[in-house]
Amino acid sequence: MRNLIISAALVAASLFGMSAQAAEPIESGKQYVELTSAVPVAVPGKIEVIELFWYGCPHCYAFEPTINPWVEKLPSDVNFVRIPAMFGGPWDAHGQLFITLDTMGVEHKVHAAVFEAIQKGGKRLTDKNDMADFVATQGVNKDDFLKTFDSFAVKGKIAQYKELAKKYEVTGVPTMIVNGKYRFDLGSAGGPEKTLQVADQLIDKERAAAKAAK
């Protein structure tokens, strides 16, 4: 019985330690940085969380199994946005691919397959015709894809996202932005799970600030 009590106490202590670790306070300049100038959010009244990524980034691909379940559980006052980082070359090609799929309303159906094809399938997907052939295997109309790919709507989004990346002072991926004010990444946060812990605490910080301002 004594051993059982000790075991239970150890388990409780362990759980408490994990909880305390999860709730460890974050500091500006350590786990995250405050942007020089705040960037307006897309949906006023909601806390915006942005992930900047690149299909050619293995760290972004490895982050997917961690961030996707987290996104699914976000409360209704949080608006999550995925934005492709575009620094030229294949970054721009993959960014245009993502934006095209998003504009067509099929990004959520094809996103994982594109990542898998580039990271594990050996596909480059930097040519629009190769892209069209691939997304067609995922049920996307090839002609509609090519038409949308060169549309003014997509070109406008490309310009918008490139400008946002500059304002966010992004130099690598995956990078996260909370409410247009705070920037952090896997390195500064300490890994995938801790990255989301930082995001959670910054979301709470912004929620509390909004409540206090009312």
UniProtKB/Swiss-Prot annotation:
CDD domains: DsbA_DsbA (cd03019)
Matching Pfam families: DSBA
InterPro entries: DSBA-like_thioredoxin_dom (IPR001853), DsbA/DsbL (IPR023205), Thiol_disulfide_DsbA (IPR050824), Thioredoxin-like_sf (IPR036249), Thioredoxin_CS (IPR017937), Thioredoxin_domain (IPR013766)
Cellular localisation: Periplasm
Signal peptide extent: 1-22
Single GO molecular function: disulfide oxidoreductase activity
Coiled coil ranges: none
Domain Thioredoxin residues, every copy: 23-154
CC terms in the record's Gene Ontology section: periplasmic space
Keywords carried by this UniProt record: Disulfide bond, Periplasm, Redox-active center, Signal
Domain of life: Bacteria
Disulfide-bonded cysteines: C57-C60
Primary location recorded for the protein, binned into one broad class: periplasm
Main function: Involved in disulfide-bond formation. Acts by transferring its disulfide bond to other proteins.
UniProt record similarity statement: Belongs to the thioredoxin family. DsbA subfamily.
Protein name, per record: Thiol:disulfide interchange protein DsbA
Taxonomic source organism: Pseudomonas syringae pv. tomato (strain ATCC BAA-871 / DC3000)
